[in-house]
Amino acid sequence: MIIEEQVVLVDQQGRALGLQEKMQAHRDGALHLAFSVLLYRETTQGIEFLMQQRALGKYHSGGLWTNTCCSHPRQGETLEQAGLRRLTEEMGIVGLESLDDIASFVYRAELDNQLIEHEWDHVLIANGTELAIIPNSEEVKSYRWWSKADLELGLADTPELFTAWFPQVLQYVINELSSQ
């Protein structure tokens, strides 16, 4: 039996309205709850961010670079629980105990395959120093740690290599880390 994945629909204030099948929500462009996790580490050269290149077989944005992982919380699941679950499912990361919810924003982007991302996206962060990474090849084509400078240069020179939501996620994380 195939279990339908559902997303939590929200209003413009982020309040839950109900559920909709995930692919239908993306065809309709329905506003729904999502999260983007970005792990960072401090090195002698500065802060680095753990990025993944989405697997080519993903239902959208395959092959593009993005934050460590992203998805949608299930009904009754907190954003932190969902973020930790997807870190394990996508990146094979276990042992991280918590994520900080630092910001949220709404974005709408028309994607490939006639899909529309319209999300109330929460930005979740944690220090990812010394975590073992064993990516799931169905989710992740590649991964690497990027410096802030390399990311800013990549976004300026080749924005088409990154997902639609990533520039906003990165800006919120940079602002948060520079205020600490």
Curated annotation (Swiss-Prot):
Subcellular location: Cytoplasm
Active site positions, chain numbering: C70, E119
Cross-referenced CDD domains: NUDIX_IPP_Isomerase
Keywords of this entry: Cytoplasm, Isomerase, Isoprene biosynthesis, Magnesium, Manganese, Metal-binding
GO cellular component: cytoplasm
Chief site of localization: cytoplasm
PROSITE patterns hit by this protein: NUDIX (PS51462)
GO molecular function: isopentenyl-diphosphate delta-isomerase activity; metal ion binding
InterPro entries: Idi_bact, IsopentenylPP_isomerase_typ1, NUDIX_hydrolase-like_dom_sf, NUDIX_hydrolase_dom
Catalysis performed (reactions): isopentenyl diphosphate = dimethylallyl diphosphate
Transmembrane segments: none
Binding residues for Mg(2+): C70, E90
Chain positions recorded as Mn(2+) binding sites: H26, H32, H72, E117, E119
Enzyme class, spelled out: isomerase
Cited Pfam families: NUDIX
Keyword Lipid metabolism on entry: no
Stretches assigned to the Nudix hydrolase domain: 30-168
GO BP: any one term: dimethylallyl diphosphate biosynthetic process
Cofactor note: Binds 1 Mg(2+) ion per subunit. The magnesium ion binds only when substrate is bound. Binds 1 Mn(2+) ion per subunit.
Cofactors: Mg(2+); Mn(2+)
Family classification: Belongs to the IPP isomerase type 1 family.
Function, as annotated: Catalyzes the 1,3-allylic rearrangement of the homoallylic substrate isopentenyl (IPP) to its highly electrophilic allylic isomer, dimethylallyl diphosphate (DMAPP).
Protein name: Isopentenyl-diphosphate Delta-isomerase
Lineage of the species this protein comes from: Bacteria, Pseudomonadati, Pseudomonadota, Gammaproteobacteria, Vibrionales
